[in-house]
A protein has these predicted regions:
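Short, small-residue-biased leader/transition segments that mark boundaries at the very start
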Residues: 1-2
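Conserved short secondary-structure transition element at the edge of the structured enzyme core
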Residues: 20, 39, 48-105
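A generic structural signal for secondary-structure junctions
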Residues: 30-31, 102, 119
């Protein structure tokens, strides 16, 4: 999304990010140095960069402060972006569904922390 942020905002259009949780990478399940036993683990390798890990760390920290999940925080971060009309996320389990329907309101400071981590 952020690669195209300038194009979207300069043309006064909104984006609809299809992978709002970056194929599961932003759920907090993937952590640096931890092997995840999942058939989907291979789909997140492109996100496993210094920047990606910084975003996950920030999501986890903010989630703790809100007594929430990294998934809920990631979706709140997208909702806080005026260029995003609505994020799309999917769930495989009931537990995941509870995480993605939770509504969290982030402070501007928290949004800034996430924006800096993703820059």
């Amino acid at each position: 999304m952020y690669k195209r942020q300038g194009v979207v905002t300069s043309n006064n259009i909104s984006a609809l990010p299809f992978y709002g949780l970056a194929r599961g990478f932003l759920t907090g399940k993937y952590r640096q140095g931890v092997t995840v036993d999942s058939i989907r683990a291979g789909s997140v390798t492109d996100y496993q960069t210094e920047r990606g890990w910084a975003v996950v760390d920030a999501l986890v920290d903010i989630a703790r402060a809100h007594h929430s999940s990294p998934s809920a925080i990631a979706l709140a971060w997208l909702r806080a972006n005026p260029a995003v009309s609505t994020p799309i996320a999917s769930a495989r389990t009931v537990e995941q569904l509870h995480e993605i329907v939770e509504v969290v309101h982030l402070s501007q400071t928290e949004v800034n922390i996430l924006n800096r981590a993703s820059a």
